[in-house]
Amino acid sequence: MAHKKAGGSTNNGRDSESKRLGVKRFGGESVLAGNIIVRQRGTKFHAGTNVGIGKDHTLFALTEGKVKFAVKGPKNRKFVSIEAE
């Protein structure tokens, strides 16, 4: 005979897979055209010069150069741009 009472069940034990969001190339880093700079939900960062934006708001380089982050405008928005090397 078992000398252990049956353990109760639980409703926990699940979590969603991480989405690996965030900045992939930091300020001053060299990038090639097509390189992903930021993966994000919504426009936490806005596309500046030579930066494209995907349908999921991913920012990517349109030309090669160096990544530059800047805060601009009356709403203090964060912009990402590519400067030619």
UniProtKB/Swiss-Prot annotation:
SUPFAM superfamilies assigned to the protein according to its UniProt record, in alphabetical order: Ribosomal L27 protein-like (SSF110324)
Pfam families: Ribosomal_L27
Gene3D superfamilies given in the database record: 2.40.50.100
BP GO annotations: translation
Tagged with keyword Electron transport: no
A GO cellular component entry from the record: cytosolic large ribosomal subunit
InterPro entries: Ribosomal_bL27, Ribosomal_bL27_CS
Keywords: Ribonucleoprotein, Ribosomal protein
Residue span of region Disordered: 1-22
PROSITE patterns xrefs: RIBOSOMAL_L27
Domain of life, per lineage: Bacteria
One GO MF term: structural constituent of ribosome
Family to which the UniProt record says this protein belongs: Belongs to the bacterial ribosomal protein bL27 family.
Matches recorded under PANTHER family: LARGE RIBOSOMAL SUBUNIT PROTEIN BL27M (PTHR15893:SF0), RIBOSOMAL PROTEIN L27 (PTHR15893)
Protein name: Large ribosomal subunit protein bL27
Species of the source: Vibrio atlanticus (strain LGP32)
Classification of source organism: Bacteria, Pseudomonadati, Pseudomonadota, Gammaproteobacteria, Vibrionales
